């Protein structure tokens, strides 16, 4: 019998949530996703030192201003890592816009344009890139404009139905609803443990998936942020699942037989009027978990971006 990972691949597109080339070679995902935390982690890998050196040298040629050099080196490094990953996956790479721009639509769009340009200069067509943006109102509005330009987006840090609905209404290519971080919040808030079927993160993604299919939205649902393989197995059949190396390994070593749990419905429900900004903000604000986890996620990505920039600044000074 095929291992659990191979079975899962027959129902769901598997994406590697890592910047680690060796892990990607091992598990042969369709796509890969990165974020500031994963780029920081990848930057510690000795095999990537040449990519960092290239980013530093390139940044020095762009500007004499140290702050601009740091910004350029950071973007170039993310793209360099993405280019290497694209040599190994047949699909797409997700590269994230600086989390500190999460509440600035125009600067998010400008950063997306810069990342796409850097990929194109490295010989990568925009059809192989997803621009990752936080699922704030501003991030969703930025994605709407980028999608209209033909730049596909991955809306991340998504914890609530209101965020998912707004993304679909904006015509976003793909969303990354988080599973494990939702579970973390509820375990801390209630003091309870949850089995996979009743896991609040699994329930959330299932609701979003069913809503999208019932309403005929084309936005891809890619479950993200997993704590255990039970969550993953309960979401078999989801459009895509992005999974970290440790859980990919666990799935590859498992012989558990699985069946699809998420199945697209054939009934189409009439689409409601799109959420206004005021409606979105009110509905989102009513979800204490989503408010907490979005804010925390943005802060933590910004912290790791800052750590990466400290490392790059030291190298730029040499």
Curated annotation (Swiss-Prot):
Cellular component terms (Gene Ontology): cytosol
Active-site positions on this chain: 132
Subcellular location: Cytoplasm
Catalysed reactions, as listed in the record: D-sedoheptulose 7-phosphate + D-glyceraldehyde 3-phosphate = D-erythrose 4-phosphate + beta-D-fructose 6-phosphate
One Pfam family in the UniProt entry: TAL_FSA
PROSITE patterns, sorted: TRANSALDOLASE_1, TRANSALDOLASE_2
Keywords, ordered alphabetically: Cytoplasm, Pentose shunt, Schiff base, Transferase
GO molecular function: transaldolase activity
Enzyme Commission number(s): 2.2.1.2
Matching SUPFAM superfamilies: Aldolase
One BP annotation, GO: carbohydrate metabolic process
Pathway: Carbohydrate degradation; pentose phosphate pathway; D-glyceraldehyde 3-phosphate and beta-D-fructose 6-phosphate from D-ribose 5-phosphate and D-xylulose 5-phosphate (non-oxidative stage): step 2/3
Main location as per UniProt: cytoplasm
Entry's family note: Belongs to the transaldolase family. Type 1 subfamily.
Assembly information from the UniProt record: Homodimer.
Record function comment: Transaldolase is important for the balance of metabolites in the pentose-phosphate pathway.
Protein name: Transaldolase
Organism: Shewanella oneidensis (strain ATCC 700550 / JCM 31522 / CIP 106686 / LMG 19005 / NCIMB 14063 / MR-1)
């Amino acid at each position: 019998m095929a291992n659990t990972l191979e079975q899962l691949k027959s129902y769901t597109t598997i994406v590697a949530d890592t910047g680690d080339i060796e892990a990607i070679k091992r598990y042969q995902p369709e796509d890969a996703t990165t974020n500031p935390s994963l780029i920081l982690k990848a930057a510690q890998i000795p095999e990537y030192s040449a990519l960092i050196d290239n980013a530093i040298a390139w940044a020095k040629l762009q500007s004499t201003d140290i702050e601009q050099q740091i910004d350029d080196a950071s973007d170039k490094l993310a793209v360099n890592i993405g280019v290497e990953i694209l040599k190994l996956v047949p699909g797409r790479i997700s590269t994230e816009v600086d989390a500190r721009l999460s509440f600035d639509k125009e600067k998010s769009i400008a950063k997306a344009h810069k990342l796409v340009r850097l990929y194109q200069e490295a010989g990568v067509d925009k059809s192989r890139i997803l621009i990752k943006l936080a699922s704030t109102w501003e991030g969703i509005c930025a994605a709407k404009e980028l999608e209209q330009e033909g730049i596909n987006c991955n809306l991340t840090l998504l914890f609530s139905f209101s965020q998912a609905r707004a993304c679909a209404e904006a015509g976003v290519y793909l969303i990354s609803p988080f599973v494990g971080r939702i579970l973390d919040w509820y375990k801390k808030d209630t003091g309870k443990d949850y089995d996979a079927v009743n896991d609040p993160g699994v329930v959330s993604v299932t609701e979003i998936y069913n809503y999208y299919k019932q309403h005929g939205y084309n936005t891809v649902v890619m479950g993200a942020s997993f704590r255990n393989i039970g969550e993953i197995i309960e979401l078999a059949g989801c459009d895509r699942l992005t999974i970290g190396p440790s859980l990919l390994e666990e799935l590859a070593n498992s012989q558990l037989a699985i069946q699809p749990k998420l199945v697209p419905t054939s009934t189409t429900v009439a689409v409601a009027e799109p959420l206004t900004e005021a409606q979105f903000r009110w509905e989102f604000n009513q979800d204490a978990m989503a408010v907490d986890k979005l804010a925390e996620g943005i802060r933590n990505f910004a912290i790791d971006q800052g750590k990466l920039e400290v490392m790059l600044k030291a190298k730029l000074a040499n």
